[in-house]
A protein has these predicted regions:
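The canonical Cys-X-X-Cys-His
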Residues: 48-59, 204
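Juxtamembrane interface at the cytosolic side of transmembrane helices
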Residues: 219-224, 228-252
Length: 252
């Protein structure tokens, strides 16, 4: 699922097609002091695991990252349980054969397909992009991902769609080869939050943003410290120079 968020199908756009301006959300992670909502990150991972991971890989993430500071911050036990819920190919064994085993925290996220050709064949000729850094790879970033997820609607009467193509007002040409991935009730959040389409879109977008920028909170904290340091340094230099020049003026 989520196929072609990154590689939309530009199939003879209709003259009446107009790409709408992206939705703008007041994300908690934006701004100088922005930080991720832990609960949203954990829910976003659940959306990825139960909806997106059937088609999309996240090859740059390991399960242990889910327990690191600044991320979803699952407990060690939760991370182990999450990893163990996946089967990982390993080997060769003493007989030279490959085998499968339960995942470990050190393992990379398991890909839904064994190779690129298999993923293309399973998705009608389209390659479902890896989602590890998808937010950084798209103009508009988080707002783009959220808008596309929320952009499905009935097409205008005079708008032509080919078979296997869907109308999305936030795509260029308003056409996309990905069926609507989110709908209310498609999953049940473990924390009891109502899984509305809007809530799931925000949560998975937050999770994908963290995946693309896992050091965001550390960078923001460092930035604040640097600004405070520069303000103090500038103030110290100003008053030091003022005192030095006052002595020079007196001597003159």
């Amino acid at each position: 699922i989520l196929v072609l968020i990154a590689i939309s199908a530009f199939i003879n756009p209709s003259k009446s097609a107009e790409q709408s301006e992206l939705l703008k959300i007041n994300w908690t992670f934006k701004g100088l002091t922005g930080k991720f909502d832990r609960a949203s990150l954990q829910r976003g991972f659940q959306v990825y695991k139960e909806v997106c991971s059937s088609c999309h890989s996240m090859q740059y993430l390991s399960y242990r990252n889910l327990g690191e500071e600044g991320g979803p911050e699952f407990s060690i036990e939760e991370v182990k349980a999450i990893a163990a819920s996946f089967e990982v190919e390993d080997g060769p064994d003493s007989q030279g054969e490959m085998f499968t085993r339960p995942g470990r925290p050190s393992d990379r996220f398991v890909s839904p397909y064994p190779n690129v050709n298999a993923s293309i064949a399973a998705n009608g000729g389209a390659y479902p992009p890896d989602m590890s850094v998808l937010v950084k790879a798209r103009p508009g970033g988080a707002n783009y991902i959220y808008s596309v997820l929320m952009g499905y609607s009935e097409k205008p009467m005079d708008f032509k769609l080919e078979d296997g193509v869907y109308y999305n007002k936030y795509m260029s040409g308003n056409k996309i080869k990905m069926s609507q991935p989110l709908s209310e009730g498609i999953i049940e959040y473990t924390d009891g939050t109502l899984a509305t389409e809007d809530q799931m879109a925000k949560d998975v977008t937050t999770f994908l943003t963290w995946a693309a920028e896992p050091e965001l909170e550390t960078r923001h904290k460092t930035g604040v410290k640097v600004i405070i340091y520069l303000i103090l340094l500038t103030t110290l230099v100003f008053f030091s120079m003022k005192r030095i020049w006052s002595r020079v003026d007196t001597e003159i």
